[in-house]
Amino acid sequence: MNPKSEVLIAAVLFMLLACVQCQLTFSPDWGKRSVGGAGPGTFFETQQGNCKTSNEMLLEIFRFVQSQAQLFLDCKHRE
């Protein structure tokens, strides 16, 4: 693979990553088609009280990763 094609692939991947947005918060009704009212635009609207804020969810994910890393280190020290 020549350097020009590698740069082109990297640029395309970078552009795709810049356009991607992920959902970090999930409500108990995530994935269900019968969410909310039947009016237009209500399918994707968030319901009050079901979702945490982004900061709360990121903190929860961080704590989970931190606890899993600690468990891994504890197992590593036992060996």
Curated annotation (Swiss-Prot):
The gene is Akh. Residues 1-22 form the signal peptide. GO terms for biological process: carbohydrate homeostasis; G protein-coupled receptor signaling pathway; glucose homeostasis; lipid homeostasis; neuropeptide signaling pathway; positive regulation of glycogen catabolic process; positive regulation of insulin secretion; positive regulation of triglyceride catabolic process. The lineage of its organism: Eukaryota, Metazoa, Ecdysozoa, Arthropoda, Hexapoda. The modification Pyrrolidone carboxylic acid is found at Q23. Residues 34-79 form a propeptide. This is Adipokinetic hormone. It is found in: Secreted. The keyword Disulfide bond does not apply. One of its GO terms (molecular function) is neuropeptide hormone activity. Belongs to the AKH/HRTH/RPCH family. Probably causes a marked increase in hemolymph carbohydrate.
